[in-house]
Amino acid sequence: MSGVLRGLAVVVQDVELARALYREGFYGRFLGYDKVKRDEVDKVSAPLILALYEALYLAERGRIKVVAEDGAEIPPEKLAELGRGMIRNFDDVYKIYKYFRDLGYVVKSGLKFGALFSVYEKGPGIDHAPMVVVFLEPDRGISATDITRGGRLGHSVKKTFTLATVLRQTGEVVLLGFSWAKL
């Protein structure tokens, strides 16, 4: 029931746990595989690679224990602290990830779309992600370039382009979505 912290990721070697986590919410990605569909999970016998924010989310819910390479357990608070030291704006990125997960969405990396996250209603291989999420630092304003970029990106990949930030005063996640419209 554990994953080993290796750099910016947590590796789940136990194949049964890896399959269960992926089946449960499409957490992580299997080493050497792209999008694995739910009905293909039992054929995979590779480790599951979790991003730090995914591992933290699962650890906070008691689904996994994260351990160091020497086997020492890393509690969720310490994992968050490590994340802050390695990833810029880790707390905000995690809050945004958690926000969507808590609403029941499947959240995957949006890197191939030039975004922070791709957000699915059901999961990769089942439906297409209707939304790509880009992180906007809280102290930075929205520029016309951000809006133009968002419109073009959203249109080119047929997804709602969403700017996400966390308000400093309240810690609330705020979203601003752009969809392409033909006039």
UniProtKB/Swiss-Prot annotation:
The yes or no answer to whether the keyword tRNA processing is present is yes
Q: Please give the catalytic activity noted in the UniProt record.
A: pretRNA = a 3'-half-tRNA molecule with a 5'-OH end + a 5'-half-tRNA molecule with a 2',3'-cyclic phosphate end + an intron with a 2',3'-cyclic phosphate and a 5'-hydroxyl terminus
Q: Does the keyword Lyase apply?
A: yes
The entry's keywords:
Lyase, tRNA processing
Which enzyme class, named as a word?
lyase
Q: Name one GO molecular function term.
A: nucleic acid binding
The signal peptide stretch is: none
- Name the Enzyme Commission number(s) assigned to this protein: 4.6.1.16
Q: Identify the HAMAP family for this entry.
A: EndA_short
What is the purpose of this protein? Endonuclease that removes tRNA introns. Cleaves pre-tRNA at the 5'- and 3'-splice sites to release the intron. The products are an intron and two tRNA half-molecules bearing 2',3' cyclic phosphate and 5'-OH termini. Recognizes a pseudosymmetric substrate in which 2 bulged loops of 3 bases are separated by a stem of 4 bp.
Q: Which PANTHER family match?
A: TRNA-SPLICING ENDONUCLEASE SUBUNIT SEN2
What family classification does the UniProt entry report for this protein? Belongs to the tRNA-intron endonuclease family. Archaeal short subfamily.
Task: List the protein's name.
Answer: tRNA-splicing endonuclease
Q: Which organism is it from?
A: Pyrobaculum neutrophilum (strain DSM 2338 / JCM 9278 / NBRC 100436 / V24Sta)
